[in-house]
Amino acid sequence: MDSDQTPLINPSLFEECAQNHFAAADSRSRRPFHIEPSYITSINDDEPQRITSEASAMNKRIHYYSKLSYPSGGGLIAPDHVLPAPEEIYVYSPLGTALKIDGSDGSEKNSSIVTIFMIWNTMMGTSILSIPWGIKQAGFTTGVCVLFLMGILTLYCCYRVVKSRGTIPLTDTSTWEFPDVCQYYFGSFGRWSSLLFSMVSLIGAMIVYWVLMSNFLFNTGKFIYNYVNDVNITDDVLSNNGTDKVICPNPDSTGPLNKSMDTYYGNGTNLEHFETWWSKTNTVPFYLVVLLLPLLGFRSPSFFAKFNILGTVSIIYLVSLVTLKAAHLGFHLQFSWNQVQTFFVPEFRVSFPQLTGILTLAFFIHNCIITLLKNNRNQKNNVRDLSIAYLLVGLTYVYVGVVVFASFPSPPLSKQCIEQNFLDNFPSSDILAFVARIFLLFQMMTVYPLLGYLVRVQLLGHIFGDIYPSIFHVLALNIAVVGVGVIMARFYPNIGGIIRFSGAACGLAFVFVYPSLIHMISLHRRGQLRIHSILIHVSIIVLGISNLIAQFFM
């Protein structure tokens, strides 16, 4: 009797058969192996399951179709209405077992290398433009140390997110995301609070994108106008001497000024007219509305998703640009802990929380890491692949931040001149910077509708249960999101400030608080919670709260 209850399909043979089975080009050739999922006694990913007599009857019924034939000799197949959905396919053995197989498993699983690259590509975003400024705010030595420490801390919290589903007993969590785990532990509060902080991260990213797109579009238009009209420029701003010019747009201010500081020689009337209608903060943010607002109304983001490769190209180009500029400019460093510096900054500065806020968003992937790891071919390698991806992201940030900071020409310029967007330290006439801005502008214009789609899915889906309740709901949401971006680009175009506030806010929940609380609650329910674990995870929560509070005093 015991042998009668054991699985009758060898797992290794089953995997080989299933791979060939689902690789068939004609899905109809697989139809005799479909049965209704409701007839499966239980679902378990680890081993085949015994099936009921109803499932056996269904199998015989489908085989019956294959026994019938046309008068001409052609065999019949089961009609479409008999078959389950593709995502509910079970492979059945007449000997009495059945296994559920996702049709995509055999062909769309990713190797570890692809998974690592996907995580790296997802995390690399606009924060990289502000890393050199963040290091300047923290001090060089402190900034590099904070980079490594924040990378380790966010990696550990991300590891806790990955393991969070496994802490829930007697429940199939294979399709759950982290907000579902939060709802399980914290009820409706967990659901709505996770939605709130997710909105903060998404809308914060959309605001940063709008500010940067306004910046890039302004400088691109300025470069084209000067080139077409043969306008000669003499910079009144502080700059170094040499072919690779680096400028200090705001020598007496930590934030960007809303005016041009260049002297032009050409047709003065046309130039004044151009400057009136082509202003970084007064006009260009409004021009973007005409370009981007219609794109937010698309029902599906699949078209824009095809351009994701541009993000990788942009990052590779930025790294190449930084390397080339550093090779020409050389390194300019002076290590000193003295607070009074003319051209350099001390190694430690009390404004270092500005960097921690930026890095919280720079290393933020906690709300979607479960989704990215689901398609990893070998689930046992999830933690290893996640760690490698974080290492690569951290090294990329360190490389760009350190090289830009170290190569900034001091003297004659002060390190205080490093801008929140380090591309602003290159004049609009710089061809290499012009190409970088073009790359980033086009990439952001394709990613922005994707972010808007995610906002629509999460917000309207939670409130109305439909991601497209009506064109009026969608239009009102899009106008509100775009309006916030325009207002910030007009009155507060400081991407460093926006990134650090949104990063500290969304990171408070998804990075610091929820993963730590869930881990402690699960240990407590199993009777395994110890004092050292409490101290460690409470300290992480306190760090997250302190990180957010500190942003208001910087």
UniProtKB/Swiss-Prot annotation:
Disulfide bonds join C248-C417. The keyword Membrane applies. GO terms for cellular component: late endosome; late endosome membrane; lysosomal membrane; lysosome. InterPro entries: AA_transpt_TM (IPR013057). It is found in: Lysosome membrane; Late endosome membrane. Glycans are attached at N232, N241, N258, N267. It catalyses: L-leucine(in) = L-leucine(out); L-tyrosine(in) = L-tyrosine(out); L-glutamine(out) = L-glutamine(in); L-asparagine(out) = L-asparagine(in). Residues 1-112, 161-191, 294-302, 371-387, 452-472, 522-533 are cytoplasmic. Residues 134-139, 219-276, 328-349, 409-430, 494-500 are lumenal. A motif (CARC motif) lies at residues 437-447. Residues 122-127 are annotated as: Important for arginine binding and amino acid transport. GO terms for molecular function: amino acid transmembrane transporter activity; arginine binding; cholesterol binding; guanyl-nucleotide exchange factor activity; L-amino acid transmembrane transporter activity; L-arginine transmembrane transporter activity; L-asparagine transmembrane transporter activity; L-glutamine transmembrane transporter activity. Glycosylated. The chain crosses the membrane at residues 113-133, 140-160, 192-218, 277-293, 303-327, 350-370, 388-408, 431-451, 473-493, 501-521, 534-554. It is a multi-pass membrane protein. A motif (CRAC motif) lies at residues 450-456. Keywords: Amino-acid transport, Disulfide bond, Endosome, Glycoprotein, Lysosome, Membrane, Metal-binding, Sodium, Transmembrane, Transmembrane helix, Transport. Arginine binds at S127. One of its GO terms (biological process) is glutamine transport. The keyword Membrane applies. Associated component of the Ragulator complex. Associated component of the Rag GTPases heterodimers. Belongs to the amino acid/polyamine transporter 2 family. SLC38A9 subfamily. The cytosolic N-terminus part of the protein mediates interaction with the Ragulator complex. The cytosolic N-terminus part of the protein mediates interaction with the Rag GTPase heterodimer in a RRAGA GDP-loaded state dependent and upon arginine binding, leading to the GDP release and SLC38A9 dissociation from the activated Rag GTPase heterodimer. The CARC and CRAC motifs mediate binding to cholesterol. Lysosomal amino acid transporter involved in the activation of mTORC1 in response to amino acid levels. Probably acts as an amino acid sensor of the Rag GTPases and Ragulator complexes, 2 complexes involved in amino acid sensing and activation of mTORC1, a signaling complex promoting cell growth in response to growth factors, energy levels, and amino acids. Following activation by amino acids, the Ragulator and Rag GTPases function as a scaffold recruiting mTORC1 to lysosomes where it is in turn activated. This is Neutral amino acid transporter 9. The gene is slc38a9.
